[in-house]
Amino acid sequence: MKKNLGQVFTDKWLVNLILDFSGYTDNHILDKKIIEPSCGDGAFLLEIVKRYIDSALSKNWSIQQIKEGLENHIYAIEIDKKYYKEAILKLNKLLEKYQITGVKWNILNEDALKIHQYNGQMDFVIGNP
């Protein structure tokens, strides 16, 4: 579905397919940094966070360890303030299911083309093709 600013929102099945093909699966993600440079309302982020939490829980991580992992390994950028806020709301709602609160998300409300602070620091750069 296409919106203003040329935004294209990704269906969940395609999100999962892209994450699977990229290798962002199971035990290979807890020490990896990932960024979604145009996160929209959070389609990729929601699945990324879910996979991260599920992987951490399978390794018996504490809630505090998971929270720190989310804050230090998952990044995103969204230019549209409406979708930036919506993505954060959806992520916090997802966290409620896991009884995790107070995550300080590394999500910027900026133009990804003008952000260079993450260059060369990420293991995965994921987004709508």
Description of each model-found segment:
Residues 1-129:
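SAM-dependent methyltransferase catalytic region
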